[in-house]
Amino acid sequence: MQKKDVNNVLNIGATRQENQICPHTNKKCIKLSKTEKGICSFIFKDTSQIICPNYFKKIDFVKYAADIIFSGKNYKVIKELKYKDNYFDYVIVNNENHSDFFVIELQTLDTCGSYKYFYNTSNKPLTVNWKTTEKNLISQIIEKGALLKNYEAKLVVVLQNTLFDYFNLDNIETPDGEIIFMIYNNNSKNINFERKVCASLELIKNRFNTCNKLDLIEIISKKL
């Protein structure tokens, strides 16, 4: 397959339109820059990998989460709420009791390399930056999860199955955990809800603190 055969490689979205309007929000693409065009997703290891959070707006993830947590309660949605040093993507609030709420965060994959690779073979290939994505997401889960725990509020993380599988968290599932992963697949023309996994904040902290310790020990051992 030719690298320049863009239609077979990328789901370009807004960049194929002269007005650069995102197909998921009907607003200007947030991925544009002076040097590179915006991209919604790209094919990596035979799977369409989501790299823009607006891609999730093709589905009603708010309703799915509210059905799980609020079970028929009336609610309102607050978008992009700032609290001290934190930004919450969505805060879902019970209309009848404003102290009853939960938070939704959208997480997509970080990349490294250049989008220009698909237009110019001299550029470094675009690929998934798993380590950076893991670092950013886990730090957010731990920090925001700890904050929300003070209010007995849950944190819902919307993400793609490939990212969740990379974390290997299935074996720490906790039925009433503070963190709820809403996992979607993107292997067909439509993004589909696949499953939810509840996890304890403490178990997540312990899992990744242990991994970090092992990583450091491994680095030290290689230097000896």
Predicted feature locations:
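A cross-family glycoside hydrolase active-site/sugar-binding cleft signature
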Residues: 80, 105, 158
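Active-site beta-strand-loop-beta-strand hairpin of nuclease catalytic cores
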Residues: 92-117, 121
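General "foldedness" signal
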Residues: 66, 117-120, 167-171
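Conserved catalytic-core segments centered on acid/base and nucleophilic motifs
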Residues: 89-93, 145-148
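Nuclease-adjacent, charged terminal/linker segments that flank catalytic cores
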Residues: 1-87, 217-224
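Short, well-ordered loop/turn elements at secondary-structure boundaries
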Residues: 85-87, 97-99, 150-152
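Non-catalytic C-terminal interaction segments of nucleic acid-processing enzymes
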Residues: 1-35, 125, 131-224
